[in-house]
Amino acid sequence: MAEETQNTVATESNNEDRKGRRGQRGEGRRGERRNRREENHGDELLDRVVTINRVSKTHKGGRTFSFAALVVVGDGNGTVGVGYGKSREVPAAIAKGQLDAKKHMFSVPRVRGTITHPVQGHDAAGTVLLRPAAPGTGVIAGGSVRAVMECAGITDVLTKSMGSATAVNVVRATVDALKQLEEPEEIAARRGLALDEVAPDALLRARAAGIAEARKAREEAAAAKAAEEKDGE
């Protein structure tokens, strides 16, 4: 009888140990997933679905339908990318487009929410012209170009689309134009000229004001953080 009692106690103890280990493993997995979600939430990006096309492919047994999504992704602060995704379901096509856009992100030179100089981009039969604009002008553009500007963080710009009106051509022409943008220092160095001979005074003043505003915002944020830490102590 004593042996049976000891065996029962040992079995219950082993079961509790296994449950404890399973609980720890489960909690570890849940914790990892929770951490990944928090990291992804903290690294959020803007995304815009420009267009979704239905594609049909004919086989011997009939036709197969799929969807193609053109997606723009950016951080709203000078970085943007465009991607194209295909799948038999719309959500999967959009997800693939987002991943493709994140792989092709690039930086866009800006001065207080506008571009540094006029530029023209091309793709196939599509042409897009971009011009700097004064603060408060807004984004004067169609839906396809506007999506790229919003994700890139450009708030004031004048645009004109010529030639093909296909969304894919317009977006790619816009990206081609943005990739041609240069900082004034780069243009001056390439031409062997002084900075004030390349960039207009208004542009240089606007950039200096933007840099001063950004520095002030960083200092205020650092001071607020230091005050919070001091109050917490």
Curated annotation (Swiss-Prot):
Compositional bias per record (Basic and acidic residues), positions renumbered to this chain: 15-40
GO CC terms in record: small ribosomal subunit
Keyword terms: Ribonucleoprotein, Ribosomal protein, RNA-binding, rRNA-binding
GO biological process: translation
S5 DRBM domain: residues covered: 45-108
Compositional bias ranges of the Polar residues kind: 1-13
GO terms assigned for molecular function: rRNA binding; structural constituent of ribosome
Region (Disordered): 1-40
InterPro entries documented for this protein: Ribosomal_Su5_D2-typ_SF, Ribosomal_uS5, Ribosomal_uS5_bac-type, Ribosomal_uS5_C, Ribosomal_uS5_N, Ribosomal_uS5_N_CS, Ribsml_uS5_D2-typ_fold_subgr
Primary role: With S4 and S12 plays an important role in translational accuracy.
Protein family: Belongs to the universal ribosomal protein uS5 family.
Domain comment, as recorded: The N-terminal domain interacts with the head of the 30S subunit; the C-terminal domain interacts with the body and contacts protein S4. The interaction surface between S4 and S5 is involved in control of translational fidelity.
Subunit architecture: Part of the 30S ribosomal subunit. Contacts proteins S4 and S8.
Entry protein name: Small ribosomal subunit protein uS5
Organism of derivation: Bifidobacterium longum (strain NCC 2705)
